[in-house]
Amino acid sequence: MAEVDTFLFTSESVNEGHPDKLCDQISDAILDACLEQDPDSKVACETCSKTNMVMIFGEITTKANVDYEKIVRDTCRAIGFVSDDVGLDADNCKVLVNIEQQSPDIAQGVHGHFTKRPEEIGAGDQGHMFGYATDETPELMPLSHVLATKLGARLTEVRKNGTCPWLRPDGKTQVTVEYRNDGGAMVPIRVHTVLISTQHDETVTNDEIAADLKEHVIKPVVPEQYLDEKTIFHLNPSGRFVIGGPHGDAGLTGRKIIIDTYGGWGAHGGGAFSGKDPTKVDRSGAYIVRQAAKSVVANGLARRCIVQVSYAIGVPEPLSVFVDTYGTGKIPDKEILKIVKENFDFRPGMITINLDLKRGGNRFIKTAAYGHFGRDDPDFTWEVVKPLKWDKPAA
């Protein structure tokens, strides 16, 4: 039998104690708090952090009465930043707040001062967004991304439940998968490399770190069928990672947009998600095209699919919609495009209603760590597959 042609593809993730992800979570915690009291809140909240300091800044127009400083401290504390030696002390760090109202120019262009009906609300900005889906995992997400993300989530789990008490909040993961291309569809064959770098306390040895990570993090996450004697493990390869969180590196909202989406697969229009209300198409547009791409694959129209949508500020209708199934479509892409346009409303006001995106609570903070897509949680409304009617070609 001829040797199968394979290739390697790598995705990375960071867990909730990474300084950039800390900032994403604070931005979304503030969005949640605003939406909970005032579903029409307009929020563009950025966060940055460095040693002993968190700053939030941006534009928020809301009727909600929100204690920004309390939300910042509560979010840091929940992640595990409770003392200087782990990288940040939630109760004693400096919290700076510089929040203004949304520009009236933007407000009148997008919302017409709230006189517009939902279908008339214009996009909050220009831009283009991509949604992607692939049949290689039950989540219809890329395996390299799913494994990197789940390793990061598991790292946090064993820290918080006390299984590995030496763990500290900051950590990064990376997974290389060997794939073969099956007529445009991606088929994972094995895991080639697993890399974990996690913050740890002073007491633990590198051998203990490696043993614990293999037993309590990798084993429960990576399915046995993908591991073999040739799989490479890099476990804390730098040798020492005691200083971490905002003390180790500065953090900023919107710096982890590939981790938030598809791990380098598909494509990305460049817009970040966290801290943005649903009139910002960077977020709502990306959510609706994920639902479209996922529905195409789940309905058997294709094994792999990418959907692009684009917008102009103040204009409700998208400027373009694009579909590519990488040659895996059961019917031509132009017919799939027609089905997508008939079944999905890409106008921002309608996306907000159809995906129920004005609901706050603890909804968006959940998206701000471990990925916005492929999650099994009723709050992730864009993961709900829409049934699509299509005529299967005669055999």
Curated annotation (Swiss-Prot):
Pfam hit, one: S-AdoMet_synt_N
A single GO BP: S-adenosylmethionine biosynthetic process
Main location: cytoplasm
E.C. number(s) listed in UniProt: 2.5.1.6
Described function: Catalyzes the formation of S-adenosylmethionine from methionine and ATP. The reaction comprises two steps that are both catalyzed by the same enzyme: formation of S-adenosylmethionine (AdoMet) and triphosphate, and subsequent hydrolysis of the triphosphate.
Family matches, as InterPro entries: ADOMET_SYNTHASE_CS, S-AdoMet_synt_C, S-AdoMet_synt_central, S-AdoMet_synt_N, S-AdoMet_synthetase, S-AdoMet_synthetase_sfam
Involved pathway(s): Amino-acid biosynthesis; S-adenosyl-L-methionine biosynthesis; S-adenosyl-L-methionine from L-methionine: step 1/1
Textual note on the cofactor: Binds 2 divalent ions per subunit. The metal ions interact primarily with the substrate. Can utilize magnesium, manganese or cobalt (in vitro). Binds 1 potassium ion per subunit. The potassium ion interacts primarily with the substrate.
Origin: domain of life: Eukaryota
Names of required cofactors: Mn(2+); Mg(2+); Co(2+); K(+)
Stated name of the protein: S-adenosylmethionine synthase
Reaction equation(s) it catalyzes: L-methionine + ATP + H2O = S-adenosyl-L-methionine + phosphate + diphosphate
Residues where ATP binds: H18, D170, G171, K172, S238, G239, R240, F241, D249, R255, K256, A272, K276, K280
Residues involved in L-methionine binding: E59, Q102, D249, K280
PROSITE patterns found in the cross-reference section: ADOMET_SYNTHASE_1, ADOMET_SYNTHASE_2
Tagged with keyword Signal: no
Keyword Cell wall biogenesis/degradation: no
List of residues binding Mg(2+): E12
Binding positions for K(+) per the UniProt entry: E46
Keywords: ATP-binding, Cobalt, Cytoplasm, Magnesium, Metal-binding, Nucleotide-binding, One-carbon metabolism, Potassium, Transferase
Spans traversing the lipid bilayer: none
GO terms assigned for molecular function: ATP binding; metal ion binding; methionine adenosyltransferase activity
Similarity annotation: Belongs to the AdoMet synthase family.
Subunit structure: Homotetramer.
